[in-house]
Amino acid sequence: MPTIKLVKYLTVTAAVLTLATAPTPVAAAPEPVASEAPLQATPPAAGTWQPPLSTRGRYIVDAQGHRFRLKSANWDGAQGSWTGNGSTADPANHHAGQNSYGIPLGLDRASLPELLADFHELGINSIRLPFSNEMIHTAAPVPDAAVAANPQLSGKTPLQIYDAVVAALTHDGFAVVLNNHTRTSRWCCGIDGNERWNSGQSTPQWADDWVFMARRYAADPRVVGADLYNEVRRDVLDDPNWGLGDGHDWYAAARLAADRILTEANPDLLIVVEGINWTGLPVDGLPHGRPTLTPVRTLSHTLVNAHKLVYSAHFYGYTGPRHSGATGVGETHDPRYQDLTRDQLYQVLADQAFFVTTEGQHYTAPVWVSEFGSGAGETGTAARTWFGNITDCFADHDADFAYWPLVGWEGHDDWALLRYDTAGRRYGILGQGDWRGPAWNHLMTSATRTGYIPPVPVWRMLNTGHGDEVRSLRVRAGGDWDPGAYKAACPDGLRLTGLSHTGGRGLCTDTAAGDLRAAGNAQTVVTDERYVPAGGDWAGGYTKLQCPAGQFLIGYSRRGDRVATALCAPARTSLGLTGRTVWFDRSDNRPTDGAGGDFASGHYKGQCAADEYAAGIAFTTRLGAAAGPAALLCGPLPGLTAE
């Protein structure tokens, strides 16, 4: 993670970005190592939160609906420490001179019980636990010296040691978020062959490893999340993107992995999607920057479970909104975060990340700042001021966070909250004289919302720009209702309430009625006007796809720009037969409160009111007119209690 060594690395790589060739892929990794299954955790009686975790608006909650604020730290090492130069056997070629041997740091210096006791003393409740894909497939055991303080781990592979660490953490009451940090076991994050999830491997291979890991810990309910990939960024030649539908589309890849994890491995996991960390060339006058979560404003994820999405972002003082963190050659004249005033920093964090926590939007989700940090040896006024300002911002925003890093070696990595010497003596932020202590203590003890979080209306977008967006598992169980068409269906529990005239977007919600659908998987595919009652022409001159009486819209399909079908489901209660026509082929026609947000930026949109359901779609195929949705039939919801 970002430190002075990384800055030097970025400086060198930035200078050769336009000249270097693409990195050579490494050989394919072997199949996952057959090893003993991880221990199933038995939470201690003192545990006060009940897994699994889910989301309600901007908050993460436990199984009882109580707030669970991620007060986390990153226990790194299993993602690799080698810097990419020289022999891996030489400690000097590892970050800060610390050879992690592909396992969490500190196991050579302190026993697991001692480490966990120190973690508790910090006040954290959760651990982001990085790993590399290489770690999963490494068959060789680590040297005994790497686990000298934990001889029970002698002879084990990195994955088996990762198992033991997960089991120890969860048994002690910590929540664990698995983090796929890198592909190879190499220190992150520069031009290092680990820039994207599919650098040196295919997207299906990456997703396969995620299914493997999620299944591996599925029996441990305190393994609560899957953080899909770390700091997606430009490689030598190409940028990642958010929604272009190509092989560099991080938005689509994250959706694919989330789908597979939730449907094939563990439906209880939170899915953590980090924004894009860097695009462009860090050269004055050329496009470059740190998009972070800004693309989410116009294109957000909709998972098969509408209550499992968490977005994340990383912030370090020496990087910036358009500054890579490099020094010297390759450095631009853009401000670093630590160059910003307090007010400017607060605004930038809002613009880049915390806007996602705004309630009532299609993108509303918790935001976890899953990396930030600074060194105990930092003497710069700007860097120290930044650390105080950003921790104040987290406190003021009641944000979820994870410090980087948690554990290091004394005399090596002074960024670590806890450092241990070869005799196991502890140093760091819990001792006297660490300038970071007051800011850390303020963050850990500041006022925070606790207790029961009431359910809030959910809004989620549908996007058929590059293919199907069938988010309902009940609909999937019924098979392909319109082969060859692009299809979309709301997640189970939500109904369709809005459509765009062009672009294939939709908006789903549960507002006012909760889950409106009746039990079972019955659904109706509407392809013509057979369900339009006599005398009920609500869109004269237009083709109308109307649900049967007692049913409501949950999905749609299109062929090119033309509406193909409407997908309807029976309601759990009787629905009225009256309705109104909402036209949107010439302008937006949405409720004045803007609920759900702009789910189809740049396109005309129509949307039923919060106390209505959508019962039909009208469109035209006349020459010169767009054949997309032109009107919705919106009917009044009966007096329902949200479920």
Residue spans for each PLM region:
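Lectin-type carbohydrate-recognition ectodomains
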Residues: W459-E643
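Active-site-proximal beta-strand/loop segments in catalytic clefts of secreted hydrolases
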Residues: A63, A73-A78, P130-E134, N179-R183, ...
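Surface-exposed, active-site-proximal loop segments in enzymatic domains
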Residues: N85-P91, H95-S100, N133-P158, R186-Q201, ...
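Aromatic-rich peripheral "rim/lid" segments of glycoside hydrolase catalytic domains that contact
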Residues: T379-W459
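An active-site-proximal structural segment forming one wall of the substrate-binding cleft
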Residues: N99-I127, M135-H137, P143-G225, W250-R260
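Secretory targeting and sorting signals
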Residues: M1-P32
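Extracellular glycoside hydrolase catalytic/binding regions
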Residues: P52, H95-P104, D108, N198-G200, ...
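N-terminal carbohydrate-binding accessory modules
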Residues: A29, E36-S126
